Every structure is written in C-alpha cells, then in structure tokens.
C-alpha cells in the first residue's frame, strides 16, 4: 500500500518506466452510464489536458478495463470495490442520478453538490499532483 492507501499492485501511482527512466503518463478512465456525459467529458479532457491519457470505457467493462489500464483517476456513475481500492482518485459523477457527486482522493471523500467541468479539472489536477509525488 502507498502513503495514500492505494493498492500499488493495481495502480501506477508513482510508477516509472525502468527502461526509459521516466514517469509514465497519468491515465484517466471515463466510464459514465450516460453516453453523452462519457463522450463529452472524454473529449474535454483530451483537449484541455492533452498530457493525460484518457480512456473511454463502457460501464459494464469498468472493473476489467481498470485492471488492464491501471488509471490513476476514474470518472464513473458508480464506483466499484476494485476502483475504490485501486485508484488514486475517483469521481462518482451524479450516482443514481443524484444532484451531487462524490470525489475520493487518497481515500478521503468529499461531496460536491454541483460538479462542473472546472471542478472536475481541479480534481484531475490534484490527482496528477499526488501521482507525481508518490
């Protein structure tokens, strides 16, 4: 386990590419149940944060793709146990169509009554900062 309580077996937090001697790019996985949210968020991240690898995944493939891609941040409509234990950060965006979102960074939860793109980007930036110091 890392300082943040992240299962390092499942996370790339702090991982270096031994052959190349450099840090791997941070990965974000977007897997919201609403297709429009999934596509718009992924497109926005690719434009506004081009230094981050963004993967768009069908919700039913969340756990399998999480294990395969090892993203540091997951944006989803329902967090799973695997994501909760393995991701450095996650955003449960409007779970069950609620008006609020839940964010976890290093296991500390925060509820946001109104998640907007700026807030999502600030969570991504904080996750990246944590990724770089672990």
Predicted regions and their residues:
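Compact, well-ordered interaction domains used in eukaryotic information-processing assemblies
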Residues: 49, 68-82
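Ser/Thr/Gly-rich flexible loops in soluble cytosolic domains mediating phosphotransfer, phosphorylation
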Residues: 90-134
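Short, charged N-terminal beta->alpha structural module
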Residues: 20-60
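Acidic, metal-coordinating helix/loop segments flanking the phosphotransfer/catalytic sites
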Residues: 57-73
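Hydrophobic beta-strand segments of well-ordered beta-sheets in folded domains
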Residues: 24-29, 70-75, 88-94, 109
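Short N-terminal or domain-adjacent regulatory/targeting segments
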Residues: 1-21, 96, 115, 119
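Short, polar loop motifs at secondary-structure junctions
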Residues: 59-61, 76-81, 94-99
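Short loop/helix-cap segments at secondary-structure boundaries that form the rim of catalytic
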Residues: 66-68, 81-88, 100-105
